[in-house]
Design a protein with these regions (language model features):
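Bacterial N-terminal signal peptides that target proteins for export
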Residues: 1-9
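Cleavable N-terminal signal peptides
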Residues: 10-11, 21
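Sec/Tat signal peptide C-region and signal peptidase I cleavage site
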Residues: 17-23
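Short, glycine-/small- and polar/acidic-enriched structural segments
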Residues: 24-165, 172-178, 194-195, 202
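Predominant activation on well-ordered alpha-helical scaffold segments within soluble catalytic domains
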Residues: 40, 85, 139, 182-185, ...
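Pocket-lining segment of extracytoplasmic ligand-binding domains
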Residues: 81-83, 154-155, 161-257
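Secondary-structure end/capping motifs
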Residues: 216-304
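Conserved C-terminal helix/tail region of periplasmic/extracytoplasmic solute-binding proteins
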Residues: 291-329
Length: 329
């Protein structure tokens, strides 16, 4: 008599799995950043299928990936916590369910030869994309150096054009993230990073941001995606897998593993335990809530949007916490 409930529960579980796999695939827009290219590991190894969820990853440049999300072409997008606020205030709200990483050196202020520190930028021109993370990074560097935003002149420059602009000597420094920051160092001999995200860890968190509608309709599928992500993070944390990780990630962006390795070093991929700490609500850059408050203040100051955004509406730690509870059993 006891076997019937067990058989019934097994049947229901199989039906649920089949239903998930037969549903429309979850569509995730992603772009060229190590913490997001890392999803490719799960794709290549078939881990999403093993988890019982169908996911389609859509490759874009960064800004077009957010545009795709806003226009409804994707259910989720990989973006920074600060840009999630901008996207929500000006286009479409989202909810971050995974903190993939924080930038740990890949975002840089790269200066021309002869400029040795942030203080040397006084009265100089800096090329960067106004209102984006590189702008926030520069302001953070200026503040740490006891300077003001008015001490430099911002030349609004698309991030992917910053290497050429620095090489042309139209500006004295640029703000960009990898691979553009690295390219800037290559094209102008003698240039150097004078401030990076490693000098302000937590200024930029990288997240998986999901549409509230998709999250409500397919919560269990997004939980499966969360499980796969932390399987990826664990795989990346094992030094024995480094060659395979570099091979997979570099192939996605069409460069060599040797060229890709510095990008990986400048990205702090978060383990489950690390992520739980970053989901704390304490102020400061050590948490995503504190970091998002800094980003919100920046966005208001530079009129990226007019009304303050409540970070709590954009962040949902429950998926990470639920996985931690599963693993603790």
């Amino acid at each position: 008599m006891k076997s019937f409930p067990r058989l019934a529960s097994t049947a229901f579980a199989l039906l649920a799995m089949c239903g998930s796999l037969n549903a429309e695939p979850l569509k995730i827009a992603y772009s060229d950043w190590p913490g997001w290219v890392a999803w490719e590991i799960g794709v290549q190894k078939g881990w999403f299928k093993e988890a019982g969820v169908d996911v389609e990853f859509l490759w874009f440049d960064y800004v077009p990936s957010m545009d795709a999300y806003v226009s409804g072409k994707a259910d989720a997008v990989c973006m920074t916590n600060g840009d999630a606020l901008v996207t929500g205030a000006t286009g479409k709200p989202s909810v971050a369910i995974i903190i993939n990483d924080f930038s740990n050196g890949n975002d840089m202020i790269v200066a021309a030869p002869g400029i040795e520190s942030i203080k040397d930028l006084k009265g100089k021109k800096v090329g960067l994309e106004e209102g984006f993370v590189s702008h926030l990074l520069l302001l953070t560097g200026l503040e740490k150096a006891g300077m003001k935003a008015e001490d430099v002149t911002i030349v609004n420059t698309p991030t992917n054009e910053t290497p050429q602009v620095l090489a042309s000597k139209a500006v004295d420094a640029i703000g960009a993230w990898q691979p553009n920051s690295g390219q800037a160092l290559k094209v102008l001999p003698g240039s150097k990073p004078i401030f990076t995200s490693a000098d302000a860890p937590g200024i930029i968190y990288d997240v998986l941001a999901v549409s509230p509608e998709s999250l409500e309709k397919r919560k269990e599928d997004w939980m499966k995606v969360t499980r796969v992500w932390y399987r990826i993070a664990d795989y990346m944390a094992d030094e024995a897998n480094l060659d395979d990780v570099l091979k997979i990630l570099s192939a996605r962006v069409k460069i060599t593993p040797e060229e890709y390795e510095p990008f990986l070093k400048g990205t702090a991929i978060l383990s489950l335990a690390d992520a739980l700490k970053r989901w704390d609500t304490a102020p400061g850059l050590g948490t995503i809530y504190g970091s998002s408050k800094v980003a919100d203040d920046f966005n208001l100051r530079f009129k990226v949007y007019e009304k303050s955004q409540d970070a709590a509406k954009y962040l949902d730690p429950s998926f990470t916490k639920a996985l931690a509870a599963e693993k603790a059993k």
